Amino acid sequence: MTRKYFGTDGVRGRVGQSPITPDFVMRLGYSAGKALLGRSEMPAGDRPAVLIGKDTRLSGYMLESALEAGFSAAGVEVCLVGPLPTPAVAYLTRALRLQAGIVISASHNPYYDNGIKFFSAQGTKLPDEVERAIEAGIDQPMVCAPPADLGRVRRIEDARGRYIEFCKSTFPNDLDLRGLKIVIDCAHGAAYHIAPSVFHELGADVVSIGVQPNGLNINDAVGATAPKALCEAVLANRADLGIALDGDADRLQMVDAEGNLYDGDQLLYAIVRSRARSAPVKGVAGTLMSNLALEHALAKLNIPFARAAVGDRYVVEMLSEKGWLFGGENSGHILALDRHTTGDGIVAALQVLAALRELGGSLKELLGGLVLYPQKLINVPVMRGFPWKEHPAITSALADTEVSLQGRGRVLLRASGTEPLLRVMVEGEDAVEVTYAAEKLAAVVRESAQ
């Protein structure tokens, strides 16, 4: 059964257009509340409670009120925390023993988009079957709980401080960051009032950029998806390294002292390489988009590697199935399940810095064992749900591309789970060949989608 509203990371879209409207979000909250009531194993007389956080988008205030109203109408208690990173909501949901956590965010997207994503009581993304149960109730009539049974709403005042202390607890007690000058780019997003404090309190000399949100500038030429600002700031401040988060702080990119950028594959490798020195690493999970060089570098360390579907939720599922701890995406979602239940940009950066402290040297030296293969990714706009597999011209061009690579690389064609895009990715040893093959295939997709 396909999902009508949920993508790979919750419900997302343009604010004011279906489904990101106040009416829909209220019904989403109500349906989620009823689903929680139906599945709750709480003692009789108790009622479930949820945590609602958001990033810094202006539309977050409107959607927060709608979501709050929906849960209250269903008879579910609501705890509000205001702007807070997505992984902070996951942590606090678990720490406060609540039944679900909800984040109002469109992650790395521009301010005019927004979305809703859910976490379970364990701080993990909801399973597909629970999302389907929520979807099934969205289009049903709302029946408000009796006045005496409406959910109460309260604000958690110490949420920021609790999460800062949690992040610090994931860094080794016998290490600190004294002597390091670090530039941190918070993308004018949810970590603007948190990330600088974490690294400062651990001893680093911190320079902050992207920490002046105005509701409209989230991810605007800053953050993990626009790292040029960070590269320039690292060089201008003569910093040792830079850290870039996205709007909801669940993904990470880093920059060394020379302005070289490192993606999720490289940072995951640094963490795993360091951890493997102290204890065996059973395996690492990536995705279909993970660079082949990561797989080959891990093989040299005798560490198995497996690919999940794109989306950090599927990486988590694979890690759980295999009993592994480490995984991630090249986009910067990095998982260390012995530290957190979900991808966390701040926690991941701390794990890289711990590796840097334990192994010595610079960030560039730390990542010297992994040279990425050239990879070309082209996003082609298409109608949502575009059936590309039914277009002979596309499937034929895809097959021709695979033949042309002659085993020297790979090609991937997949629909985005969050945007109306078809992603064309070609990877191989020769950069010129890779670029040519990707552009040729993308041109066929573009023509077929018209």
Curated annotation (Swiss-Prot):
What GO terms in the biological process aspect are recorded for it? carbohydrate metabolic process; peptidoglycan biosynthetic process; UDP-N-acetylglucosamine biosynthetic process
Q: Which InterPro entries match?
A: A-D-PHexomutase_a/b/a-I, A-D-PHexomutase_a/b/a-I/II/III, A-D-PHexomutase_a/b/a-II, A-D-PHexomutase_a/b/a-III, A-D-PHexomutase_C, A-D-PHexomutase_C_sf, A-D-PHexomutase_CS, Alpha-D-phosphohexomutase_SF
Could you state what the record's PTM comment says about this protein?
Answer: Activated by phosphorylation.
Residues annotated to bind Mg(2+): 107, 246, 248, 250
PROSITE patterns named in the record: PGM_PMM
Q: Name the Pfam families on file.
A: PGM_PMM_I, PGM_PMM_II, PGM_PMM_III, PGM_PMM_IV
What cofactor requirement does the entry state? Mg(2+)
Q: Which UniProt keywords apply?
A: Isomerase, Magnesium, Metal-binding, Phosphoprotein
GO CC, one annotated term = cytosol
Q: Does the keyword Magnesium apply?
A: yes
Catalytic center at which residues?
107 (phosphoserine intermediate)
Phosphoserine: residues carrying this PTM: 107
Highest rank taxon of the organism: Bacteria
Q: Catalysed reaction per UniProt?
A: alpha-D-glucosamine 1-phosphate = D-glucosamine 6-phosphate
The Enzyme Commission number assigned here is: 5.4.2.10
Top-tier EC class: isomerase
**UniProt cross-references to SUPFAM superfamilies, sorted A to Z:** Phosphoglucomutase, C-terminal domain, Phosphoglucomutase, first 3 domains
MF GO annotations: magnesium ion binding; phosphoglucosamine mutase activity; phosphomannomutase activity
Q: How is the cofactor bound?
A: Binds 1 Mg(2+) ion per subunit.
Q: Which NCBIfam families match?
A: glmM (TIGR01455), PRK10887.1 (NF008139)
Q: What family is reported?
A: Belongs to the phosphohexose mutase family.
Q: Which HAMAP family match?
A: GlmM_B
The protein's role, per its UniProt record: Catalyzes the conversion of glucosamine-6-phosphate to glucosamine-1-phosphate.
Which protein is depicted?
Answer: Phosphoglucosamine mutase
Lineage, uppermost ranks: Bacteria, Pseudomonadati, Pseudomonadota, Betaproteobacteria, Rhodocyclales
